[in-house]
């Protein structure tokens, strides 16, 4: 595969999953849903780019002598700003729908409501607190480990979202997920392999095989738990659920690394 094609696909993934102003090619529609079959493998690469920006802020803030907690907050804030809180919005909508709806149709209706409810607010708070706390804990052990873990988590968690979109059919016919379509089994597997490979290359040298297996294993558990829950409650997936999967898998990955990185 040519480098220009890879860069174009990563650019398409960044345009869709972030606020980074990546220009579209002459033959591309910058406002159309991406071709997931084509760019699925590039989604974890785009995630790594977003994580890299957060990691740079993390290392920079730590090098300036700021407290670990402040550095962790700035790193998470950077990732949130770069994505326009896309995944956080999905997590909040999913929590509101799954927690507040008594029927499939009511859950989907709540998930489309732009207002945030108590379940969504709690989910957002816990997501932000957990990511900040986990990065703070990793920073206390090693800034390098913390930075690499953030990049790997941002990459693998977005590959998990691709797997969800393939595992389940769209829950509604007129949502963003239905418009983008399913990536297809081959494309979803390629996305997962790229995410897992990046995570392995980043975490094994810095923290070890055990940390890598634990982090990936917890991410897989989070993915399958959300897949089963989404299928049971709404009969499929939506873009919001994919965002929730990204958030939960990122938390699970960071937690797995910290479990093995801390002194025993």
From Swiss-Prot:
Domain of life: Bacteria
InterPro entries in the cross-refs: CobS
Primary location recorded for the protein, binned into one broad class: membrane
Membrane topology: Multi-pass membrane protein
Reactions mediated catalytically: alpha-ribazole + adenosylcob(III)inamide-GDP = adenosylcob(III)alamin + GMP + H(+); alpha-ribazole 5'-phosphate + adenosylcob(III)inamide-GDP = adenosylcob(III)alamin 5'-phosphate + GMP + H(+)
EC number: 2.7.8.26
Gene Ontology biological-process entries: cobalamin biosynthetic process
Pathway stated in the Swiss-Prot or TrEMBL entry: Cofactor biosynthesis; adenosylcobalamin biosynthesis; adenosylcobalamin from cob(II)yrinate a,c-diamide: step 7/7
Molecular function GO labels: adenosylcobinamide-GDP ribazoletransferase activity; cobalamin 5'-phosphate synthase activity
One GO location term (cellular component): plasma membrane
Function: Joins adenosylcobinamide-GDP and alpha-ribazole to generate adenosylcobalamin (Ado-cobalamin). Also synthesizes adenosylcobalamin 5'-phosphate from adenosylcobinamide-GDP and alpha-ribazole 5'-phosphate.
Family named by the database record: Belongs to the CobS family.
Annotated HAMAP family: CobS (MF_00719)
Descriptive protein name: Adenosylcobinamide-GDP ribazoletransferase
Gene name linked to the record: cobS
